[in-house]
Structure formats: structure tokens, C-alpha cells
Amino acid sequence: MAQLRVTQIKSKISEKQNQRDTLRSLGLRRIGAVVVREDNAQNRGYVNTVAHLVKVEEID
């Protein structure tokens, strides 16, 4: 199954609380943090919410 590599590239300072919560749900705590998540609708929604703060790569 395909997976997503999500890297936080911008700070969450001065972002809305729901975006901060979304980063925490993804497991991202600091700039440069990387997590690998399953590619499903839920995780795509999380990534879409914070798209301006993260970089996403698809991996097989």
C-alpha cells in the first residue's frame, strides 16, 4: 500500500489552533520532523489542512 512521507517545513507559530492540532495529530512537533503515514482519505485531509506548513512525498 502507498504511504506518505510528511515533513514539517514551516513553524506552527501564529497559525490557527485547528492547524496546530492537525500537526500534532500527524505526529509533527518541530520543523524538520518527518513521519510516514498510510495514504488514505483521513491522512490526505490532515495534509490538506496544513499544506502550507508541510512537504508531502508519496512512497511505495
From Swiss-Prot:
> Has the keyword Ribonucleoprotein been applied to this entry?
yes
Top-rank taxon of the source lineage equals Bacteria
Write out the GO biological process terms. translation
Q: Where would one find coiled-coil regions in this protein? A: none
Q: Which GO terms describe its molecular function?
A: structural constituent of ribosome
The protein's matches in CDD domains, at most eight in alphabetical order, are given as: Ribosomal_L30 (cd01658)
Q: Which residues cross the membrane?
A: none
Keyword list (alphabetical) reads: Ribonucleoprotein, Ribosomal protein
Task: Say yes or no: keyword Ribonucleoprotein present.
Answer: yes
Q: Which InterPro entries match?
A: Ribo_uL30_ferredoxin-like_sf, Ribosomal_uL30_bac-type, Ribosomal_uL30_ferredoxin-like
The GO cellular component terms are: cytosolic large ribosomal subunit
Tell me, how does this one assemble?
Part of the 50S ribosomal subunit.
Q: Which family does it belong to?
A: Belongs to the universal ribosomal protein uL30 family.
Put simply, this protein is called Large ribosomal subunit protein uL30
Report the source organism: Clavibacter michiganensis subsp. michiganensis (strain NCPPB 382)
- Gene name on record? rpmD
